[in-house]
Amino acid sequence: MWLDWFFPIEMLVVGLSGGVATGKSTVSSVFRAHGVPIIDADQVARQVVVPGTSTYNRLRKEFGDEYFDDEHGGVLRRDKLGKLIFSNPEKRKALNGITHPAIRWEMFKQFLTLLITGTKYIVFDTPLLFESGYDKWIGTTIVVWCDFEQEVERMVTRDNISRADAESRIHAQMDIEEKKKRAKIVIDNNGNIDELREKVKHVIAQLDKSWKPYIFRVAFGIILGVVPYYFFKYIRS
């Protein structure tokens, strides 16, 4: 990881990922309830494709008017586009190529803002932590997982979709076992929600004890001068 030069970032920046329906949102909500700032990639992804943005215009040119609801301000029809990209790897690649640079840049701006305000550490909540290469500049990574059958059942219930659609969306992402191998912290969510919350609280307690974020404050001036240069090169590559 090219940010390993600045080892305090190992604990200052925490990457949170998981499967499509493994409980990542619940984990994120526990962090937020404990006052930890969250940079939510899904939320940012919605911001960068609002009508009128350059990313929106590129998507409309790439996928056509049928994926946009002109009766409601021209907003992106996410469900319809989702069905396309989860069944078509080439279209998924095209979507990612258009949206990911804009998402990375917006997340980085939020990251710098939070650093300036003096937060202890930050959580990047992103389902594509490893697929998008975000783990290259995030030291501490957390993956929340559950068994495949549980994930399918949760998706069918939550999203009101067929089992086939649920399985297709799960298989479109990196295998959860591979994510677990790459993660520094793995949270098992095969139990109930109260058990999950207790596990997250334990992780938060571990992070709170870290001394690295405080060292980062001393090195912040140097980092602020160097990191944007390399990160800008990365997101534009």
From Swiss-Prot:
InterPro entries per record: Depp_CoAkinase, P-loop_NTPase
GO biological process: coenzyme A biosynthetic process
Pfam families reported in the protein's UniProt record: CoaE
Keywords: ATP-binding, Nucleotide-binding
Domain of life of the source: Eukaryota
UniProt: ATP binding residues: 18-25
Presence of the UniProt keyword ATP-binding in the record: yes
TM segment ranges: none
Gene Ontology molecular function: ATP binding; dephospho-CoA kinase activity
DPCK domain sequence ranges: 13-218
Key word Nucleotide-binding present: yes
Gene Ontology CC, one term: mitochondrion
Family according to the record: Belongs to the CoaE family.
Protein name as it appears in the record: Uncharacterized protein T05G5.5
Organism of derivation: Caenorhabditis elegans
